[in-house]
A protein has these predicted regions:
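Low-complexity, acidic/polar, glycine-enriched regions of mature
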Residues: 11-195
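Hydrophobic h-region of N-terminal signal peptides that target proteins for export
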Residues: 2-12
Length: 195
């Protein structure tokens, strides 16, 4: 899940607002191109799950102090339009029995406004560490975030390479071959916790 960790906050600074991600209203996805070799046909495979947990900490007075993470996604629950693909990904590539979770923790928020007004969509970059299969790499998410009353709405995307996380792109017996580049997407709805 996403847990935003507070940065050194002195007594004079306002408290960070804590938003808990709502899995039933949120979704994590991957998109990866795959080529069916015998047919020369290209397809974009999409896998998704609602098993997304985490917290986001928001500083309305100084938005750049806001933090995300850890956000945790249960990889074993990813589903696409092909059960065969899903099983192969779980067993051979993501190995989600051994490594069931992907985890992201932010280190920096870039492009945040100096002040925030409720309802205002904000485009920013969230930099941090993504861990998949026990391998951690620095990634940059491009995000649009909006606070609407007690809820935080966010859409974010980043691109990674499978080989950067220690596994080769899926290739099944000359039938289908996936690209190395994968787009990761998050649609998050989080609710502010009572102080």
């Amino acid at each position: 899940m996403v847990v935003l960790a507070a940065v050194a906050a002195g007594a004079a600074q306002p408290a960070l607002e804590r938003y808990q991600i709502l899995p039933e209203a949120s979704e994590a996805r991957y998109r990866v191109g795959e080529t069916f070799l015998g047919e020369g046909r290209f397809n974009v495979a999409v896998g998704r799950t609602r098993d997304v947990r985490g917290v986001i900490l928001v500083d309305r007075q100084r938005p750049a102090r806001s933090r995300v993470g850890p956000i945790v996604v249960d990889l074993s629950t990813l589903q696409s339009d092909s059960a065969r693909r899903d099983n192969a990904i779980r067993q051979r590539w993501l190995e989600s029995t051994r490594f069931p979770e992907a985890r992201f923790v932010s280190t920096e928020v870039r492009g945040a406004p100096s002040r925030y007004r409720d309802g205002q969509p904000v485009e920013l970059e969230v930099v941090g560490d993504l861990t998949v299969r026990g391998v951690t790499r620095r990634v940059v998410w491009k995000a649009t975030v909006r606070l609407a009353g007690p809820e935080l709405l966010a859409q974010a995307a980043t691109s990674v390479r499978m080989t950067d996380f220690g596994f080769q792109p899926p290739s099944i017996l000359g039938f289908v071959r996936a690209e190395d580049d994968v787009t990761l997407e998050l649609d998050l709805v989080a609710r502010r916790e009572s102080p």
